[in-house]
A protein has these predicted regions:
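Sec-exported extracytoplasmic/periplasmic mature domains
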Residues: 54, 71, 106-109, 130, ...
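A short, acidic, amphipathic alpha-helical segment used as a generic capping/interface helix at domain edges
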Residues: 404-414
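Short, polar/flexible loop-turn hinges at active-site or ligand-entry regions and domain interfaces
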Residues: 56-61, 109-116
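Acidic/histidine-enriched alpha-helical segments
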Residues: 68, 111-130, 195, 215-233, ...
Length: 445
């Protein structure tokens, strides 16, 4: 059973017991700030703040002191900046949960943000951005989202090397930190064996429960950083081919616009994704790898934001095999052919039944660790706010997936796999001819 509690300062707690027998607690603090809250003069700021929260507080003044405290209790700690939120993750033995809540609340609420540490950490963030710049899938993802979510706050990358052509403004990043890292924009999501009332006591004694003085100027910053949405009415396919001379392979992405985070269509799309690429014998892998020997790495992915979403076919391949494989079709025409077959013939009863059994089994395996359970609860609580609208992770299959019919999944295929909402992205050193790519994709019904 999921339980929640909200404090006078707006801080929220969402709690659930684990579905395994391990004496391990999974703790996420989810901060309601991401790259979507940034203005042009502070791009990359949310990610930079995530780094700075590890640089010490008055109580724990040095980075090494923070790390030693976590190391001393055998805790696993990590953090991630997303477009919509920032997460701080902890896995630890139940006996040390109080230590972790106390330390994490201090880190996030009371970072000293020393200018000297800021200047050192900027070099580290640049190194991280350089690593992403060498990652073809990351480049392709940024390109895709700049098109699919154009004119919205989701258009911009979380961080990229271009943001660091000039040095960050210390004052502006610090201002962003103080505006967004406040109790009313934080959620503690915990999955633990510890009783709910005991967790409440731990939060009460932490900095999460502290009342802070109102600051009108910071409130003004929040009001100016409202997330911008854009519902683009796409009426024809788009093609985006970019040369990246250091890549030995081509990275291909065929993306269709789909539904938003709150739509029930996402469950049908996720099941379809699983059927197409989430199993050993899934359609995409069998077609490209087993039957034609064309790719080692291919996948179908889905993603949803508050206003829109997408489903993408992805493949990494040798440049010479994108359009042709000798006398046979190459990767792109095979993907287009697969989509045409899905639209015309749909999926079979046996495929649907296998996909359901498989996704149910994999969701049960996920519950062996409580991390997914904790993250699921926290993100849903952030975006839905109403706990009655949150389906516990162990109930998602029975509630949303088990009852999906053949009629539903084939209807979703026809609803979203439309040529006019298709977007094709290709990056590599050796690129195909644009007109040939268009000619191939025009075969989509």
């Amino acid at each position: 059973m999921i339980k929640t509690r909200e404090w006078k300062n707006g801080f929220r707690l969402i709690y659930e017991q684990p579905k395994n027998n391990a004496l391990i607690s999974s703790i996420y603090t989810i901060c309601d700030v991401g790259s979507v809250h940034e203005s042009d003069d502070v791009r990359g700021g949310a990610h930079f703040i995530e780094h700075m929260c590890f640089k010490g507080t008055k109580k724990v003044p040095k980075t090494e002191d923070v790390y030693v405290k976590y190391d001393d209790i055998g805790a696993y700690m990590n953090a991630t900046t997303d477009k919509r939120y920032t997460t701080y993750k902890l896995r630890v033995h139940d006996r040390y949960v109080h230590n972790c809540i106390d330390l994490m609340s201090d880190m996030l609420m009371n970072s000293t943000f020393k200018r000297t540490e800021f200047q050192k950490e900027e070099k580290v963030v640049i190194e991280e951005s350089m690593r992403l710049q060498d990652n073809a899938e990351s480049i392709l993802e940024d390109l895709k989202e700049s098109v699919i979510y154009k004119n919205s706050s989701y258009e911009y990358p979380i961080d990229t090397l271009s943001y660091h052509k000039t040095l960050f403004s210390y004052d502006k990043i610090l201002e962003l930190y103080h505006a967004f890292y406040r109790a009313s924009r934080m959620i503690l999501s915990i999955v633990t064996n510890i009783p709910f009332d005991d967790v409440i006591k731990m939060v009460n004694s932490s900095y999460y429960a502290k009342l802070y003085k109102a600051n009108p100027s910071l409130d003004g910053i929040l009001q100016s950083r409202v997330i911008q949405y854009s519902d683009i009415l796409q009426t024809e396919p788009t093609y985006h081919i970019e040369k990246h001379k250091n890549l030995s392979t081509i990275h291909l992405n065929v993306t269709f616009r789909t539904c938003n985070y709150y739509s029930d269509d996402k469950y049908v799309l996720d099941l379809l994704k699983h059927l197409l690429s989430g199993m050993f014998g899934s359609r995409l892998s069998m077609l490209l790898r087993d039957k034609n020997g064309l790719t080692y790495h291919s996948s179908v992915t889905t993603n949803y934001y508050e206003h829109s979403g997408e489903l993408s076919f992805y493949a990494q391949l040798t440049p010479s095999k994108i359009l042709k494989n000798g006398a046979k079709p190459g990767v792109l025409p095979l993907i287009i052919g697969l989509i045409n077959d899905l639209v015309k013939n749909g999926v079979s009863e046996s495929e649907l039944a296998t996909a359901k059994r498989n996704i149910n089994g994999k969701m049960l395996l996920v519950l062996e660790q409580s991390d997914s359970q904790s993250l699921h609860n926290g993100i849903n609580y952030l975006l839905k706010r109403d706990v009655s609208k949150i389906t516990p992770l162990n109930k998602v299959y029975d509630t949303h997936l088990k009852g999906i019919s053949l009629h539903q999944i084939n209807g979703i295929i026809r609803k979203y796999f439309i040529r006019n909402t298709m977007n094709v992205f290709i990056i590599g050193a050796e690129l195909p001819n644009l007109e040939q790519v268009k000619h191939c994709c025009e075969r989509l019904h």
